Design a protein with these regions (language model features):
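Helix-to-loop junction immediately C-terminal to a conserved catalytic motif
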Residues: 11
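Conserved ABC transporter NBD signature motif
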Residues: 19-27, 36, 96
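Catalytic Walker B motif of ABC-type/P-loop ATPase nucleotide-binding domains
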Residues: 122-126
Length: 213
């Protein structure tokens, strides 16, 4: 399985052939979709909306798991949406149409929607895919500063090192290396996983500098 396929197992788009996945000690297959959505939010790499809404309307969709059928949003729901927009620095664009935003802004709207869910776990599948480097750094900096558990698929090794506390390196569907960035990203691991020779050095602020030979 690929890294994305592994993530799909967590948010239940695919079912495991064997084994068990639990969230806070409870097997996922024993949880309803709504119960799962109250604890887990997902941002995938394909987020083209088929209809146009304002930024605020899209972020409010994050409150859906917490509302019963036809229940109207309460003051707390609007407060959580506003707080999420503040965190992604888009409050001033709350009334803008989603389609009018840049790619980086659209991803931040989807992050705000995820935050409005109040999840205990945030899953990110290549959240910076197709974004310019500035927007990549902006988005990952916001995520890094959140007080929340995050499991992300990132293919850019240097970005993964910069923003992660713990890394898993996968090859052919299996985790072959894991640990802190400094423990995980070594010439030996890069040779084993990617088949490349390299020299890895670290800056004082623990950023990886990878030189391919």
């Amino acid at each position: 399985r690929s890294k994305t396929s592994l993530l799909k197992l967590f948010y239940r788009q695919e079912k495991p052939n064997q084994g068990l996945i639990s969230l806070d000690g409870k097997p996922l297959d024993q949880m309803s979709v709504k119960e799962t959505a109250k604890q887990m939010a997902v941002i995938t790499q394909f987020n083209q909306l088929q209809f146009d809404c304002t930024v605020e309307e899209i972020v409010m969709l994050g409150r859906t798991p917490h509302l019963s059928f036809l229940q109207k949003e309460k003051d707390r729901d609007f407060a959580l949406v506003e707080d999420a927009l503040v965190k992604v620095d888009l409050l001033e664009k709350r009334n803008r149409l989603y389609s009018s935003l840049s790619g980086g802004e659209k991803q931040r709207v989807l992050l705000a929607r995820a935050l409005a869910q109040e999840p205990t776990l945030l899953l990110l599948d290549e959240p910076t895919n197709h974004l310019d480097i500035k927007y990549q750094l902006d988005l990952l900096t916001i995520v890094k500063n959140l007080q929340i558990n995050v499991l992300a698929v990132l293919h850019d090794i240097q970005l993964a090192c910069r923003y992660s506390d713990y890394l898993y390196l996968m090859k052919e569907g299996e985790i072959v290396y894991q640990g802190t960035p400094k423990e995980t990203i070594t010439p030996e691991s890069l040779q084993a996983v990617y088949g490349v020779q390299s020299k890895v050095t670290w800056t004082e602020d623990q950023q990886a500098m990878i030189h391919y030979l």
